[in-house]
Regions:
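Alpha-helical propensity feature that highlights long, continuous alpha-helices across diverse contexts
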Residues: 1-193
Length: 193
């Protein structure tokens, strides 16, 4: 047997070339940004908005059909606290609004397409909406779907940032705080003991 000593150049993050820095960023993103953390963040926001029994679905792989959606329900009283919904409903017939206040307890978001996870795979239904005229029902449904799609779009945008973007400052801070060094190809250097 023989023992061989190999010398390996080791670099701090700031010393790496730009191509290798991108490799390091990808490694750090995968180590620090987990799917559960993103899901919990979205669920927390939905909870603050008053969405009950929320389930979040997403596929953010930069592919056709990608997106984010959620299911759950919100009470009428919580829904009209949301500025967009409140302002949009105020433009509807006053008698119709009064009837909605009296008859609709919850608004439910249901997923009807299990293959994809974008906002167009969910529909909105109103508890006890049989009394509504088709035109009024369509207007009300459009208000909620417009709000829903805008909210999903914001979450989707945040998701892409969560999984695919990290600032240079955050990478430097992470590497410095953890005293991480790298080989020339961006692999983390672990000094043998």
């Amino acid at each position: 047997m023989r023992i061989v000593k190999i010398e390996v150049p080791v670099y701090r993050y700031a010393e790496l070339n730009d191509k290798v820095k991108e490799v390091v960023k990808d490694h750090i993103l995968s180590a620090t940004r987990d799917a559960q953390g993103f899901t919990d963040s979205v669920k927390h926001t939905l909870d603050v908005l008053g969405i009950e029994k929320a389930e979040v679905y997403y596929s953010l792989g930069n592919c056709q059909g990608d997106g984010l959606c959620f299911t759950g329900s919100i009470t009428w009283n919580k829904a009209i606290e949301i500025l967009y919904i409140k302002e949009s409903i105020a433009k509807l017939n006053k008698d119709f609004i009064k009837s909605c206040e009296d008859c609709i307890y919850s608004i439910n978001f249901y997923k009807f397409d299990r293959m994809y996870n974008h906002c167009n795979t969910v529909t909105v239904e109103f508890e006890d909406s049989n009394w509504m005229y088709a035109e009024d029902f369509t207007k009300l449904k459009d208000i909620f779907l417009t709000w829903y799609k805008a909210l999903c779009g914001k979450f989707e945008h945040q998701g892409y940032k969560w999984f695919y973007e990290i600032s240079e400052e955050d990478v430097v801070e992470y590497c410095d705080n953890n005293d991480i060094e790298f080989t020339a190809n961006g692999d983390v250097f672990v000094e043998p003991t």
